[in-house]
């Protein structure tokens, strides 16, 4: 009965057993504090901060996707790319297929944690769902969507060709460009003279 109780405490990370020494109570730690919710996206700076997080994670995900992708992953990536192109043609904002493309990159890693993180974050990671178009796309919405599409095509091509370095570079460029567009939009918005 005592062994069973100790096993449960170990599984819960409440105690640690050191063979030949004994069992020790571990210090309590706060494991559930990390959250990114819509409440965390109240300013352009918040959106930029999440983009910086995405740059670090999704750059590596793209490299892993290039290394590990399957033919089925390629089909799913191509379908998401086509759905985004179709959305542009009908003057849609393209958020669902944009997110789907990034989700398919995550799936192509073969690492469920990338997919779980993308699922957790959801479409709120797409900057144009958090800020107005003038801020995220100072060059105009249609031109902006075409730029994104071109960047997605570069990511897809690198993953298809299993070029790990090119996939990382393409994803880093894509997300860094989004960050820079937001910074420029923010600066242009804050420097406008009052009427």
Predicted regions and their residues:
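Short, conserved clusters of charged catalytic residues that mark active-site
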Residues: 10, 45, 100-101, 150
């Amino acid at each position: 009965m005592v062994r069973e109780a100790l096993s449960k405490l170990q599984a819960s990370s409440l105690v640690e057993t050191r063979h030949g020494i004994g069992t020790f109570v571990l210090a309590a730690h706060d494991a559930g504090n990390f959250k990114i919710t819509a409440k965390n996206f109240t300013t352009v700076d918040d959106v930029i901060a999440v983009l910086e997080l995405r740059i670090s994670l999704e750059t590596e995900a793209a490299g892993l996707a290039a290394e590990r992708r399957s033919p089925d992953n390629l089909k799913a990536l191509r379908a998401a790319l086509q759905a985004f192109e179709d959305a542009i043609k009908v003057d849609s904002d393209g958020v669902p297929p944009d997110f789907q493309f990034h989700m398919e990159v995550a799936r192509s890693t073969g690492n469920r944690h990338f997919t779980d993180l993308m699922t957790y974050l959801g479409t709120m990671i797409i900057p144009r769902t958090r800020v107005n178009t003038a801020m995220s796309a100072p060059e105009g919405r249609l031109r902006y969507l075409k730029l994104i599409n071109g960047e997605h095509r570069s990511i897809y091509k690198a993953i298809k060709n299993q070029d790990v370095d090119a996939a990382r570079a393409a994803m880093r460029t894509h997300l860094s460009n989004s960050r820079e567009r937001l910074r420029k939009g923010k600066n242009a918005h804050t420097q406008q003279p009052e009427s």
